[in-house]
């Protein structure tokens, strides 16, 4: 008895029964937070977690003594016992309602054990056998068939028990044990005790009280214990366990359970079975109701389904195509492999595919162990060499034959189509509202692969900020690997330049560029602190330059990324432009090309080579061009640093004038821009031809490079060190202009590769190219060949967009972004669709960048001379123009024509800024010029008698949509085109290398140009200043200062592939693709205008005019078939009537060769 009492007291003083029963699980667990491994809930104490785990395992160690009810927690059992006690009090002395089902209970176990003499006889006999009242209660419990662990309420009467102790005196008077009162009958004594004293005695011990609440508290505090399988002392009250332990043991941990469903629920913890998977995102759950709740996330949004949409709400677009809301739940048909990006239709095929990766990893681990093994014998090697074979081990080491390697076309990070599949078609972007040119720092850490969901997800900005706040000691591995304290590799002066990997490695570290210094690797909380810190490195570079360190740095090969000026992460911010001397267009191109290891041009024209850690080399350049150019451009770079305080926003990148220090970069870009967007290329220094770039903007004569064809560009490159040469059979075909196919070491390979390429010659001139699309662009722009009937196959058949996408609020709408490798620079939004071929006279002055494309530049009678200079003559040098685009500087032989053409164009250019002039509608690159609803009106609608034939036609856009714009208007260009020049021989005579205009050009093209000229004449008829234009060579210098544009760019520009791509950033070719869309020349506006017509109208495919009757359209089409006569050799002169173009005859009266022929209206 004493031992049982002491055990109960120990249980009360010690830890809770749950902790005592599971003491081996919590020993040494000092964690402040305890997390459930099933549902993820956290608890501050281990005991709370243990009680919570009973919900998952189903264990209920607490059992009610009156019924079969079980409870997992002690408090729940207390509530249950109180319900039994309340029922007992209501029923008075009758047996408790909960006792009826228990057959093993006897009379002594009720609250009224001594209610009758027959019942009390057996009970009292046991008490008389030499036991006290306290021990008698235990004997009663031990002799009964009830379980020893049960808790019972004992409401007995002291007087009844005292009187029952005399067996032979049943008829004698009974006495109350509390007040010593005597009663003749036992029922009277029981009534007295119940009414006067109400005693409540504990059956498990000698505790007795007059208050039932005290007895209940005593039982709950001392006698309620858990019946767990691992706690024998707590479960057994008097040495008799309730259940035989280990009926259903766990095979993993050995824990035993009383029921099978306890064991089944327990086994889920060991095998971690997620049997219920989501078919949309791939997440898996253990329980079906978890999956049911998860599926609500993929269902339609109930809140936004009935809510009216406002105009400010962004509309979901994918590539500027408005996506309608889909109410049905999406279904994913693909599973993405996290290692190689392959897509699979189900999870089984993905698991089978993952076995390949596991085998490859296992083979890599076995490879070092097998290195010590001997190779094949000499006889075997000789035999393999005779058969031109090699051992399989050597083949396995090649990356091209590795099993399960990453497929670039199926990689969701690099492939546009796979990115759309991996994102499940969701409207998402890698980063939110990327700045122009700052996509690579926003991309860092934005895309991650979620293993649970098996898809690529976007990392939130908050997570990136938390990662950026990490201490600098825990920085990214690439900065730790190339820190200042690391030993410098051989052949490099800068210890950071050799072991610096490409910037794509920063994407896995979660650290953005904005808070990390490229020079020393320090991490700052804000971007502004990093900018202030970068000035220290810039000051140090200036000191090194002043000490004459530039020659040594040039002799080292090139500047590394660390030696460059502090390149900010956002060229569009003011701080970026102020703190970076090269934060303009050239630096943005350097940022883009440096993504994959391409060189980055220095601000002073010094080329940089990106040195990879695995490609360390000690090769030095033998030429002295680097030091020569660095010495010549030192003052220019300092000047550029002082002038770089302008905010390098998008508009400034397009419209502001370029600094003098960037001219050599632009000349270098003229050779670099033919590289593929994401192709790593080797550094080639700028050719040291002694070319100088004067700071003046006049048309001084310069000795330029000889004209080159596309194949001649390879002769200008030098062999760049720092690249390991691949095996000849593994070297990929390099189609770039900067390839090394003409390297002396690769003469045999270069000759075979170059011979294998198909050369596409131009049928109208001597231009040749390896690319058919380049030839198509050349014929379209240079020779004005109409492509109405033959459109290139890569152009979309219909570029018409929904009118909803033209709304203003869609400018910042949510849209599905490109794959992360493109960095937010996929095909940019197409220009707004044009509703007609012209604009009203009110739409021109607002356009700052102009609307005349490159194809409409001034080409006077010297057009064949341009062709000759294109094929064999000296080319024009590229230099930055005042309007922000690269322009040409004329050579010696071309200066007279530039002077001759600049005179007639000076005054119209002046009036274009003060008076509205009709111009071709919205086609160029002017992002600010948006079509207004009034552009549907016809041009030249003023009531004049001489302009009636002109009103029937719209002015067609005469240029290609992928060329930069110029400030002068299209009518002035056309007037100069139709005019004759007094200087120089006739165009078709004496220019043997230039054929006449192509015969394939339909006569409708000349008709359109004539109508354009006539429209301009009708629109500016009353202008007296136009009629009194100055002479050819006598243009006043004031007019030249208004718009400083060398007009020679119009008729001296070589429109081959080199000149086409000169105006593009290396990776911003999306603008070129944009030109092949709605506003592109390949569509010829045929599909656009036809789709814009109302139902029942017939649209002319030549000019876009619509008619209600087909007969009217046929009559109108005869006007396009008019044949213009020419006077033989001067085939480029188009003759107009004096009634249609009276102003032109007066304007060009000094040329003297204009003939007019009446235009037959009936044809």
UniProtKB/Swiss-Prot annotation:
GO terms for biological process: adipose tissue development; brown fat cell differentiation; positive regulation of cold-induced thermogenesis; positive regulation of DNA-templated transcription; regulation of DNA-templated transcription; response to cold. There is a cross-link at residues 643, 681, 1043, 1062 (Glycyl lysine isopeptide (Lys-Gly) (interchain with G-Cter in SUMO2)). A zinc finger (C2H2-type) spans 34-56, 62-84, 174-197, 200-223, 248-270, 276-298, 335-357, 515-537, 760-783, 1098-1120. Residues 561-572, 615-625 have a biased composition (Polar residues). Residues 1-431 are annotated as: Mediates promoter DNA-binding and activation of transcription. SMART domains: ZnF_C2H2. Residues 1-26, 460-512, 533-667, 679-730, 838-1007, 1126-1163 are annotated as: Disordered. GO terms for cellular component: nucleus. GO terms for molecular function: cis-regulatory region sequence-specific DNA binding; DNA-binding transcription factor activity, RNA polymerase II-specific; DNA-binding transcription factor binding; RNA polymerase II cis-regulatory region sequence-specific DNA binding; zinc ion binding. It comes from the Eukaryota. Residues 588-598 have a biased composition (Acidic residues). It is found in: Nucleus. SUPFAM superfamilies: beta-beta-alpha zinc fingers. Residues 1-13, 460-469, 542-552, 626-641, 656-667, 706-720 have a biased composition (Basic and acidic residues). Residues 496-507, 840-857 have a biased composition (Low complexity). InterPro entries: Krueppel_C2H2-ZF, Znf_C2H2_sf, Znf_C2H2_type. Keywords: DNA-binding, Isopeptide bond, Metal-binding, Nucleus, Repeat, Transcription, Transcription regulation, Ubl conjugation, Zinc, Zinc-finger. Belongs to the krueppel C2H2-type zinc-finger protein family. Interacts with PRDM16; the interaction is direct and may play a role in the transcription of brown adipose tissue-specific genes. Interacts with PWWP2B. Interacts with HDAC1; this interaction is enhanced in the presence of PWWP2B. Transcriptional regulator that binds to the promoter and activates the transcription of genes promoting brown adipose tissue (BAT) differentiation. Among brown adipose tissue-specific genes, binds the proximal region of the promoter of the UCP1 gene to activate its transcription and thereby regulate thermogenesis. May also play a role in the cellular response to replication stress. PANTHER family: ZINC FINGER PROTEIN (PTHR45925), ZINC FINGER PROTEIN 516 (PTHR45925:SF3). This is Zinc finger protein 516. It comes from Homo sapiens (Human).
